[in-house]
Amino acid sequence: MKKDVQQGEVTGEVFTRPEVVAYMLNSVRHCGKFKSLVGLRVLEPSCGDGAFVLPLVEAWLSEKPDFDSVDADSFLRACDISSENIEKLRGAVRERLIAASCARARANALLASWLVCGDFLLQEFKERFDIVIGNPPYIRFDDIPSAKQKEYRAMFSSFTERCDIYVPFFEKSLALLSDKGVFSFICTNRFTKSSYGKQLRRLIADRYHVALYLNMEHTQPFVQEVSAYPAIYIIDHNRNRVTYSATIDDAGIPTLNRVRMGQPKSELSVFKQWYKGDSPWISTDCREREAADKIARTFPTITKSAEGTEIGIGVASGADDIYINAQRVASIEPSCLLPLVASEDIHDGRISWDERYLLNPYDDNDDTQMRDLARYPLAAAYFDSHAPKLKARYCARKHPHDWYRTLDRVKYALLRSPKILIPDIQLGGNVALDECGSYYPHHNVYWITSRKWNLKALCVLLRSSFVTSQIRNVSVQMRGGSIRYQAQNLRNVHIPAWSSLSEGNVEKLVSAYESNDTEYLDAVVDAVVRDSTARQPVRLFQADLFNKEECPVCQIEHVPDR
């Protein structure tokens, strides 16, 4: 990330390729039916090197505008926090204005009103804009100065949890749209499924209309290579219109031409209704969305599939270098050590333990209480040797008498409970069973316990494509195609109720537990799923699940099979 010398802040600059800019500009003009730019007001909230501003100015100049008109003064507002960017862009725009026969003095006057150096989120705008377009900065939460975090939280309802700075850029930019205005950003797609994006998704659903959502997470639409998981968004106020959507694998001109709005042979899927409220945007294909909706209507979630079924995450110590494997550097009472299983210990649904231990500061018999270190002199000496670092943590300052506590409470009963263990980031289906209650999970491992389920049967269900596909729908995509099995995602998974499974079906699932043959496992699960409900069989990605006339969320055409 680049830092602005004058401001001393991370600017989050990622510049957009010209063909992608052209696609966005054409889409905005099509959506807003803007035949001419003259008389319009355009806003670019984070103009950078002018990837959007320069083509906009050139298109405006091609229409032979009156440079001395009020319309010329109000045509453009472009902001950037970098004074260096603003100066470079000022020179480039001035050059184009003068080349188009605009007097230098008038060009300078236009530039004075057009280009603004400063924090867009803190700027005040009296006018509303017909086009808001750009590529907002991608600055992670931890790189936002704490003073500005507080300021943004007070100003923007969408700035929740640990969200990145593009989220309030969305909120403010949308608020500046005119009634007939059109908004378009290219930026990460993280908010469409993440927890921190809930408020922004709800704001968009309640007040605006998504005209286009083009998922480009497997492409590289930027000048430099970055891991941004990008998407193009076009949003307006026309809430009675359809939504166009697609996922593309490259950002080249031929592909972009195939997903242009208004083209008779476009490969865009068309939704009669986009996602409601804060629901995650699970798919760009309306057939997949309806299939997922049908699963949700047919089956309960995991925690509701049987009484006493719980989902949780392993322990975060707040100082792994101190709490994990302390026995390798010091003598520790064995009763203070818990076998700890981490994500790297789980491969192909099996546990291969690396003999790491967690130094447990909590009482084994009452995990709401800390250990009495007077009874454990070796552990006490070890904690004392690390006291400065442990006491400096926020959780220790908040509980000074319990300064040696872990960040999360260690629940000793969980260690001895049979449980399913699921690494967070994986390609899918890597689900293991701690049948005897031998391990405590680390914070990158999620766990499931149940009083009713046969855990081998549940484990097979969770390994199947039936469940992996659901996780993939609600998870953000990671590098290499990995997905996240976070608790929030697991809680959105729907499976047959335990009570709906016959003894024979339970036996089929259990018999498949030892198999590494995914096709066999999927066939078993598919048969069990079909048999567990009297309704029409449900397959998340069955190609012929719906004809286009049957699909209740679609209109016109689906994305052609590719």
What is each model feature region?
Residues 58-63, 94-96, 148-152, 200-203, ...:
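Glycine-rich, phosphate-binding/catalytic loops in enzymes
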Residues 280-511, 518, 524-528, 550-554, ...:
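Polybasic, glycine- and aromatic-enriched phosphate-binding surface used to engage nucleic acids
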Residues 9-10, 14-25, 47-54, 81-87, ...:
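Signature of N6-adenine DNA methyltransferases within the class I
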Residues 90-122:
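S-adenosyl-L-methionine
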Residues 37-38, 71-76, 110-111, 126-128, ...:
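Short, well-ordered loop/turn elements at secondary-structure boundaries
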Residues 66-70, 102-110, 203-207:
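Short, conserved catalytic or adaptor-binding loops enriched in Gly and charged residues
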Residues 116-117, 187-188, 342:
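A secondary-structure boundary/capping signal
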Residues 1-95, 136, 166-169, 193-201, ...:
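Class I S-adenosyl-L-methionine
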